[in-house]
């Protein structure tokens, strides 16, 4: 079995002490004439004049893992042999003269290097073929191999520090470059932690530098492309973030603006509600407080006996003969003066007549027909001098005390028309002829006529009251009634118009009136208490327009003027309607009683 050594090295006979060769090697004298002596550990004696061996990591381009020769005993590290051979070939000798013993050792080392060169060529061919296959895995495994190399370097350095067989430094041990196979054949034991040395010189170093420069240029171009793309991406992200921030700010400003509008509307509505509720509560509290105060004062005050009204006016002097008995006793029988005549008691008769009227109003009796028989009429006229037939003389001849005084009551006051109230409307209507006195039934009729006309003239009123003999007094009284009707009507309109403004109604078109409205019910109760007739539909429109006119006037601040209602009066005056003809019927007042 061939040992793999050159023929010259194979024919050499070992000496007794190991590897001394007595014969020289003339063929290699040309190349190694100035070969420096080698120490026992493979290093030159002058370490300052030698080249420092540069340690490189195994290139991944070769496609082989690091230290492959350690797995097989027959393989020899190509990089180690090549590096050792090239290093020794190009090394500069430190001295021109060496001893023969040292020259013999140099020749032995030269043979070893020659065998390593041949073995290197074979391995390089194999590595070149394997490198073609490994180029495809270069990009994916670059980072992994670098990590593995760093780890192996650390392990190797730690092993070198911990190995007891190491007699020299790590750098000198790397220079031993003795292959494992040659050491085994020659009987030389190397440590288990033999390291692979990569020394690149000459053309190999230049090729590697060229490859590194190409890779550096490619890497620089790739980094530039990646950097430019990264800048563009950063710019795109910056602009996107800026636009997103602007959109958020605009949306936040819009939300704030809408919230401000909503808050202002809420504040205005809350303010209006608070003012309205406060006024209502204040009125209620004041009204309750006033009622309580009145009740307390009445409870604390002593009971008072009602005093009868004075029989004479306060400025009239008292009559000393008022309570005295008549100077003569009543005489039975007739005469010029009836027996019940009392000249000093005329006011008692007047008071009795007034009490009779009050009693009749309290009884609220219905109107009944009075039937007078002929016999009764004849009997009443049979004895004209009888006491029952002749009326009291005080009715025809009033006493001096019955004459009206300053500030007192006149006799004509009893015959005037009643007031605006129809409280005496249940007394009945005494029809059957014309009269100059206005009754409560006439007042009720006038209120119903107000549904159609608010400003009637005197001629129109006379045509709808045919049973009244009009004179100056009752005509003025009838006109006064309608004036009072209008006053109540406009007061209600002003009240509800201010209430609508307090509720926040600012547009007149938002005001609507129907027969179910509170305002219309108040008016109908006042003018048509017993619902004798159905309220006309036209009245709803008139009430609505009146309320709107008051609303606009108060809203514009015209109510501060003294005569601000005159404009409204002119508008309402144009809304007059025709009064129905059934108001002229003679029995219309009788229907009002039912």
UniProtKB/Swiss-Prot annotation:
Any one GO BP annotation for this protein: glial cell development
Alphabetically ordered keywords of this record: Developmental protein, DNA-binding, Homeobox, Nucleus, Transcription, Transcription regulation
Keyword Transcription regulation in annotation: yes
Main location group: nucleus
Prospero-type homeo domain span: 435-493
Amino acid composition bias (Acidic residues), ranges on this chain: 136-162
Composition-biased stretches (Low complexity): 73-101, 379-389
Inactivation phenotype: Lethality at larval stage, L1. Surviving animals do not develop into fertile adults. Animals have abnormal sensory function with their bodies harboring lesions and signs of progressive degradation. Defective excretory canal formation with down-regulation of genes, including exc-5, ifb-1, gck-3 and aqp-8, involved in this process. Seventy percent of L1 larvae do not form excretory canals, but have a large vacuole around the excretory cell body. The remaining larvae form impaired excretory canals that rarely extend beyond the pharyngeal-intestinal valve and do not extend to the somatic gonad.
Gene Ontology CC: one annotated term: nucleus
GO molecular function, one term: DNA-binding transcription factor activity, RNA polymerase II-specific
Ranges annotated as biased composition (Polar residues): 1-13, 36-50, 105-117
Biased composition (Basic and acidic residues): 118-135, 369-378
Chain residue ranges for the region called Disordered: 1-20, 30-180, 358-389
Superkingdom in the source lineage: Eukaryota
Pfam families: HPD
Written domain comment of the UniProt record: The Prospero-type homeodomain and the adjacent Prospero domain act as a single structural unit, the Homeo-Prospero domain.
Physiological role: Transcription factor involved in developmental processes. Controls the transcription of genes required for excretory canal formation.
PANTHER family: HOMEOBOX PROTEIN PROSPERO, HOMEOBOX PROTEIN PROSPERO/PROX-1/CEH-26
Official protein name in the record: Homeobox protein prospero homolog 1
Provenance organism: Caenorhabditis elegans
Designated gene of the protein: pros-1
């Amino acid at each position: 079995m061939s040992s793999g050594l050159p023929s010259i090295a194979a024919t050499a006979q070992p000496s007794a002490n190991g590897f001394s060769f007595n014969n020289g090697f003339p063929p290699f004298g040309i190349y190694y004439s100035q070969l420096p002596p080698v120490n026992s550990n493979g290093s030159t004696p002058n370490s300052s004049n030698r080249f420092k061996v540069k340690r490189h990591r195994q290139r991944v381009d070769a496609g082989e893992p690091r230290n492959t020769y350690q797995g097989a005993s027959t393989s020899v590290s190509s990089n180690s042999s090549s590096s050792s051979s090239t290093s020794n070939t190009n090394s500069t000798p430190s001295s021109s003269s060496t001893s023969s013993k040292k020259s013999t050792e140099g020749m032995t080392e030269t043979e070893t290097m020659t065998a390593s060169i041949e073995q290197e060529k074979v391995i390089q061919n194999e590595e070149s073929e394997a490198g073609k296959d490994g180029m495809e895995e270069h990009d994916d495994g670059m980072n992994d191999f670098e990590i593995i190399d760093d780890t192996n370097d650390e392990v190797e350095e730690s092993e070198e520090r911990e190995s007891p067989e190491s007699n020299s430094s790590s750098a000198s041990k790397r220079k031993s470059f003795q292959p494992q196979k040659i050491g085994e054949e020659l009987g030389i034991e190397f440590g288990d932690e033999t390291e692979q040395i990569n020394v690149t010189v000459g053309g190999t170093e230049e090729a590697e530098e060229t490859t590194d420069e190409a890779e550096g240029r490619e890497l620089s171009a790739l980094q530039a492309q990646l950097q430019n793309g990264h800048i563009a991406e950063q710019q795109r992200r910056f602009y996107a973030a800026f636009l997103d921030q602007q959109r958020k700010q605009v949306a936040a400003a819009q939300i704030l603006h809408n919230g401000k509008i909503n808050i202002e509307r809420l504040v205005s509505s809350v303010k209006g509600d608070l003012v309205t509720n406060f006024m209502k509560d204040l009125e209620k509290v004041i009204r309750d407080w006033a009622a309580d105060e009145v009740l307390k004062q009445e409870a604390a005050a002593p009971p008072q006996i009602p005093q009868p009204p004075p029989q004479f006016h306060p400025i009239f002097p008292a009559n000393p003969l008022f309570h005295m008995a008549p100077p003569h006793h009543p005489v039975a029988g007739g005469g010029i003066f009836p027996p019940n005549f009392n000249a000093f008691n005329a006011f008692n008769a007047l008071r009795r007549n007034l009490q009779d009227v009050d009693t009749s109003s309290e009884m609220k009796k219905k109107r009944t027909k009075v039937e007078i028989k002929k016999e009764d009429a004849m009997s009443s006229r049979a004895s004209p001098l009888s006491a029952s037939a002749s009326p009291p003389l005080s009715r025809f001849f009033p006493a001096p005390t019955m004459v009206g005084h300053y500030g007192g009551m006149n006799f004509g006051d009893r015959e005037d028309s009643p007031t605006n109230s129809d409280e005496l409307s249940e007394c009945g209507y005494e029809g059957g002829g014309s009269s100059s006195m206005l009754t409560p039934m006439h007042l009720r009729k006038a209120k119903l006529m107000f549904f159609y006309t608010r400003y009637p003239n005197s001629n129109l009123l006379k045509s709808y009251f045919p049973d009244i003999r009009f004179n100056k007094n009752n005509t003025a009284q009838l006109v006064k009634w309608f004036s009072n009707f209008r006053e109540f009507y406009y007061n209600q309109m002003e009240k509800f118009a201010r209430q609508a403004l307090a509720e926040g109604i600012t547009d007149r078109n938002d005001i609507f009136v129907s027969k179910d409205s509170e305002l219309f019910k108040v008016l109908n109760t006042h003018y048509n208490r017993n619902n004798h007739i159905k309220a006309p539909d036209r009245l709803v429109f008139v009430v609505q327009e009146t309320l709107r006119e008051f609303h606009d006037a108060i809203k514009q601040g015209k109510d501060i003027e003294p005569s601000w209602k005159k404009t409204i009066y002119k508008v309402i005056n144009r809304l007059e309607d025709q009064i129905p003809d059934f108001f002229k019927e003679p029995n219309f007042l009788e229907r009002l009683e039912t």
